[in-house]
UniProtKB/Swiss-Prot annotation:
Region (Disordered): 146-276
Record bears the keyword Zinc-finger: no
GO CC field: extracellular region; side of membrane
Biased amino acid composition, Gly residues: 220-245
Protein name: Probable cell wall protein PGA41
Organism: Candida albicans (strain SC5314 / ATCC MYA-2876)
Cellular compartments annotated: Secreted, Cell wall; Membrane
Role description: Probable GPI-anchored cell wall protein that may be involved in cell wall organization, hyphal growth, as well as in virulence.
Chain positions carrying an annotated carbohydrate: 229, 268
Keyword Repressor found: no
Membrane topology classification: Lipid-anchor; GPI-anchor
Family to which this protein belongs: Belongs to the IHD1 family.
UniProt PTM: The GPI-anchor is attached to the protein in the endoplasmic reticulum and serves to target the protein to the cell surface. There, the glucosamine-inositol phospholipid moiety is cleaved off and the GPI-modified mannoprotein is covalently attached via its lipidless GPI glycan remnant to the 1,6-beta-glucan of the outer cell wall layer.
Length: 296
């Protein structure tokens, strides 16, 4: 139990000592820089933040790097001007900040004699400003790169539009295809006319074959008009009949499919062929009778 109490006491003393050290360091900083002011409002707090951003400093009051950093910060002086520290009897003592241009001691008030001091009077401030210019030039270069990449993207879009125009040209060449269709249709008409001519020839062959009694033509259904019995076949006069008996046991060899195709192409063939066959058969019978009478 005693050990716990002693340990707790040691921890408390250590924390208090650390806090005291931090407070002492802050107080020493204000004292070493030869100025003291109280935090009145947010503007004063922002001014202190500007001081802290300039970095840690040593006990030498004539530290030019730290002073040059404060002299180049316009926000630092603007915050001090906007602060109410002057009206609350807060004195801003400074024998170092920007005092290189105006030797003397500045006592707080509404007028300022050292705020607009040029920072170029300090060696370190000149190097700081040059670093600022370099950083601005580095920041500008990425924007140029972005702009150039944007231009490249726009050129890519124009190339894509050219590809679309070329595809449109191909479609225009495709429009010439109807002329090909016209030529093909004309060739079809010519071939159909040739079919009509060939069908006419088939009519002639049918009439000549029927006069001799041949029944092997593929376009005529039945012959047998001048068979051995001397009488017309029952199916010979009708093209759709499929053919009659020609010589006792002999039948037509043409298939029904060829007969139907002939009838579709030649609707008048069933009337022309039987008429010619009857006419020729009557002439042949008359000739035979004259020969028989002449022999008698």
């Amino acid at each position: 139990m005693k050990f716990t109490i002693v340990l707790f006491t040691l921890i408390s003393v250590t924390v208090a000592a650390a806090a005291t050290t931090t407070t002492t360091a802050a107080a020493n900083r204000i004292q070493n820089k030869a100025y003291a002011y109280y935090y009145c409002n947010s503007y004063c707090t922002q001014a202190v933040n500007d001081e802290n951003s300039c970095g840690y400093y040593d006990t030498d009051v004539s530290n030019q790097e730290y002073y040059a950093c404060l002299c180049t910060k316009s926000s630092y002086y603007n915050n001090l001007r906007s602060c109410d520290c002057f009206t609350k009897v807060v004195y801003y003592y400074s024998t170092s900040i920007c005092s290189r241009a105006n030797v003397g001691t500045y006592v707080g008030g509404r007028t300022s004699t050292t705020w607009g001091v040029s920072a170029t009077k300090y060696r370190s401030s000149t190097s700081t400003s040059s670093l600022t210019r370099k950083s601005s030039s580095i920041g500008a270069s990425p924007s140029i790169a972005i702009a150039s990449s944007t231009k490249e993207s726009s050129s890519t879009e124009s190339s894509s539009s050219l590809e679309q125009s070329s595809s449109a040209g191909q479609s225009s060449s495709t429009e010439q295809s109807p002329s090909t269709e016209v030529s093909s249709s004309s060739s079809i008409e010519e071939s159909s006319s040739n079919q009509d001519i060939s069908s006419t020839d088939s009519i002639t062959t049918i009439s000549s074959d029927s006069s001799t009694g041949n029944t092997d033509s593929p376009t005529q259904g039945g012959g047998g008009n001048s068979g051995n019995n001397g009488s017309n076949g029952d199916g010979g006069n009708d093209a759709s009949g499929g053919g009659g008996v020609v010589n006792e046991n002999e039948q037509a060899s043409s298939p029904p499919s060829s007969q139907s195709s002939t009838n579709s192409n030649q609707p008048n063939s069933s009337q022309t062929a039987p008429g010619a066959a009857n006419y020729l058969s009557s002439v042949s019978v008359g000739t035979l009778m004259i020969l028989v009478l002449g022999l008698i």
